[in-house]
Amino acid sequence: MPYVTTKDNVEIFYKDWGPKDAQPIVFHHGWPLSGDDWDAQMLFFVQKGYRVIAHDRRGHGRSAQVSDGHDMDHYAADAFAVVEALDLRNAVHIGHSTGGGEVARYVANDGQPAGRVAKAVLVSAVPPLMLKTESNPEGLPIEVFDGFRKALADNRAQFFLDVPTGPFYGFNRAGATVHQGVIRNWWRQGMEGSAKAHYDGIKAFSETDQTEDLKSITVPTLVLHGEDDQIVPIADAALKSIKLLQNGTLKTYPGYSHGMLTVNADVLNADLLAFVQA
């Protein structure tokens, strides 16, 4: 299997499909999943002639289960290691949830200064800041994330069933069509990763203030968010991010969940393609 070794000797797994001379689209997955969460998008774009790449974040999926470095700076640096190893240029970076935070940090710190980024997309993304603080009074209280940590530590396998069965895909809403395969695939991806990485990752996605990252991004950036996102509430994420981006476009989806890339893939794929081609 293909791996890139980072500067701190962490092996990062990646998938690389399509013509090597085509425009690359790089996908950054959410917590606690893997590059497999992008199957619907990768198949769609590779069939359109693009080169598609998705890596597993450190401690997630097939990447090394290291003890340290489960923070946004290392996430972004690991992504840059993949980009450099594959010499990707003119790339579109698409991030979901925590992966959206990874994209924002990567573009701001590495990709944009190196001239390797054409566009960025933040889907149901965590920036600018999820945690409630004095400067972010609309955020979620720390007790919410402490609850995540306790549930993970007490019984990770059950927690990783409860999340996709309930709020992640909106399967807890009246009249929702529940897809058991989607639930099982979420659980499979989560359990493939490291409990330590997942535990530490809760702090990374909830407490990292990415206000300055967003302000520094100048490439065209598309912000997509479901209006019924029960995981990353839109009011404290996309509606704030769009005000910080210099060259941003916002599109919201009434009734759509945090996991809309999977359960509404046909709609999202069409919108992503339109942005990439614009």
Swiss-Prot record:
Alphabetic keyword roster: Antibiotic biosynthesis, Chloride, Oxidoreductase, Peroxidase
Active site: S97, D229, H258
Leading EC class: oxidoreductase
InterPro entries the UniProt entry points to: AB_hydrolase, AB_hydrolase_1, AB_hydrolase_fold, Epox_hydrolase-like
Gene Ontology terms describing biological process: antibiotic biosynthetic process
GO MF term set: chloride peroxidase activity
Positions of the AB hydrolase-1 domain: 24-259
The enzyme's E.C. designation: 1.11.1.-
Gene3D superfamilies: alpha/beta hydrolase
Family: Belongs to the AB hydrolase superfamily. Bacterial non-heme haloperoxidase / perhydrolase family.
Subunit structure of this chain's protein: Homodimer.
Function field: Chlorinates and brominates suitable organic compounds. Involved in the biosynthesis of the antibiotic pyrrolnitrin.
Protein name: Non-heme chloroperoxidase
Organism: Burkholderia pyrrocinia
